[in-house]
């Protein structure tokens, strides 16, 4: 499957995800946290391989630091997941309600983000941060 086909599939799934109740989205965030902890050693081993390859290719120290995913970064992302679960549902909030004219009202309501594309380099923690924010919202 290429990127265009994957994008089409995502667009088809987006309305289903957008309709998920907050309880289900929060359970998904909790499950991500659980799975990260359950697979921590596999994740760390994969990261060690990435770091080794980066070192062989003389990657800059600043990039090496960003590429590192260790116990501290795992603790950070799992704490972020917990914090995100505790936030109120961002969907369906009225942020503006204005009578423009007789019979004409302007209302701004928050809605799900939808399908996004992200390019990031050397930040394994970014995957969890970005995907969890999208899931919550």
Residue ranges and their predicted role:
Residues 1-105, 133:
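N-terminal Rossmann-like NAD(P)+-binding subdomain of aldehyde/semialdehyde dehydrogenases
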């Amino acid at each position: 499957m290429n990127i265009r086909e994957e994008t089409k599939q995502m667009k088809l799934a987006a309305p289903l995800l957008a309709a998920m109740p907050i309880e289900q989205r929060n359970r998904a965030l909790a499950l991500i946290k659980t799975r990260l902890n359950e697979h921590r050693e596999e994740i760390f081993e994969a990261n060690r391989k990435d770091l080794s390859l980066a070192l062989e290719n003389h990657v800059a120290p600043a990039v090496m630091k960003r590429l590192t995913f260790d116990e501290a970064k795992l603790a950070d992302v799992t704490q972020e997941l917990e914090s995100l679960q505790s936030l109120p549902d961002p969907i369906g909030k009225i942020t503006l309600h204005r009578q423009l004219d007789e019979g004409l009202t302007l209302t701004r309501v928050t809605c799900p983000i939808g399908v996004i594309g992200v390019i990031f380099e050397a930040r394994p923690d970014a995957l969890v941060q970005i995907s969890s924010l999208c899931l919550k919202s």
